Amino acid sequence: MARNVVVIGTQWGDEGKGKIVDWLTDRATGVVRFQGGHNAGHTLVVGGEKTVLHLIPSGILRENVTCYIGNGVVLSPGALLEEVDMLEQAGVDVSGRLRISETCPLILPYHIAVDGARELAKGMEKIGTTGRGIGPAYEDKVARRAIRLQDLFRPERLACKLKEVLDYHNFLLKNYYHAATVDYHQVLDDCQIKAERIRPMVADVPKLLFEASQADNNLLFEGAQGALLDIDHGTYPFVTSSNCIAGAASVGSGVGPQMLNYVLGITKAYTTRVGSGPFPTELSDATGEHLAQRGNEFGSTTGRPRRCGWFDAVAARRSIQINGVSGLCITKLDVLDGLETLRIGVGYKSKQSGEMYDALPFGADDLAAAEPVYEELPGWQERTAGIRNFDQLPQAAQNYLKRMEEVCQTPISMISTGPDRTETIVFHHPFG
């Protein structure tokens, strides 16, 4: 009986999803990306070799796995081919195992130009995007003016649609942002060149996924970013431009929701955030520096330092609720090694009224007006990195994990104690 698993981040991204997806693909025949674009950064370590993927699903490093990019992904042809070349130079067969939905909206140079001009214009109020054109590409999709992957293979349609959409964006760039415009012929020529390399990988992804599931093949749906960055349920407006929650796996790939059997929520043992936006448990002291240095907390896509803080159970519970999380995978436990005392944010208190509440507010302003209520637990000095058996963890680490489980009101299925595939403790395998 086929079992399909959705892997999502329960925080603000960077939870370590790439390593877990790579580990889970041992029992999957297909891995599906269903939202986001090359703003994601999934880091995999196999046999000591580090690979960072931004667009192609993490299952590509398993020879028996077919990878799919669903319609919910905004696709940069240039970023795609750069990643294909990088992997194939390393001996990985990509073009023979990657299938891309023809209805993916494209990210083209004018999206990147608008993204950069917009952030520059906002100054101190900027969102902190990756500058890769993700937001403007999703805007075109919703406005029904997007150029989709299928358009690359219809030259007359491509030329006409590109002229129309580029006139619109160049008007904005020139007259509103006072920025340089984008050349039509250069974009058109580049699209036509890249089209022939991409054509063999284009497929009817919903049909292939349905057939794979009907044939009792396990599928893994790989989320990007994290639930707290979701365009609807995140800390708006400091969010990404797509739906990052588990429900998006259905919409963004073309499979029915009844085909999704298990949701694995990836959660760091502490909390991080990149870019702007409220972060109640953020630490600006020596402990925050410890987390940043030990956790190597620098964005794999932008290289920006991540903001670090204590584990926020209130935010985690909201993510668990909106995703219907079946089980948690706790990552980066080893980063807490050496800390005398640990804290978990178990509630919020209004900075103005002192009112207590235990649910994540909707919207950035309300969250910024909250301060965390902490519960303290003893830390541990022993090393947890690489441990593969729960009973071998220090007692204080075991107690910390049990408390995380209690305050999240969700069972822990897995624990990651290091970046390599093998550095994993498993209580319940999502594929059964």
Swiss-Prot record:
Subunit structure: Homodimer.
Residues annotated as the enzyme's active site: D14, H42
Function description: Plays an important role in the de novo pathway of purine nucleotide biosynthesis. Catalyzes the first committed step in the biosynthesis of AMP from IMP.
Enzymatic reactions: IMP + L-aspartate + GTP = N(6)-(1,2-dicarboxyethyl)-AMP + GDP + phosphate + 2 H(+)
UniProt-listed HAMAP family: Adenylosucc_synth
Cofactor: Mg(2+)
Biological process annotations from GO: 'de novo' AMP biosynthetic process; IMP metabolic process
Residues the entry annotates as binding substrate: S300, T301, T302, G303, R304, P305, R306
Keyword Nucleus: no
Binding site for Mg(2+): D14, G41
Native organism: Nitrosomonas europaea (strain ATCC 19718 / CIP 103999 / KCTC 2705 / NBRC 14298)
Binding site for IMP: D14, E15, G16, K17, N39, A40, G41, H42, T130, R144, Q225, T240, R304
Protein name per UniProt: Adenylosuccinate synthetase
Annotated GO MF terms: adenylosuccinate synthase activity; GTP binding; magnesium ion binding
UniProt-annotated location(s): Cytoplasm
Pathway(s) served: Purine metabolism; AMP biosynthesis via de novo pathway; AMP from IMP: step 1/2
Family: Belongs to the adenylosuccinate synthetase family.
Enzyme class: ligase
Keywords, in A-Z order: Cytoplasm, GTP-binding, Ligase, Magnesium, Metal-binding, Nucleotide-binding, Purine biosynthesis
Domain of life of the source: Bacteria
GO CC terms, sorted: cytoplasm
Cofactor binding mode and count: Binds 1 Mg(2+) ion per subunit.
Residues reported in the UniProt entry to bind GTP: 13-19, 41-43, 306, 332-334, 416-418
EC number: 6.3.4.4
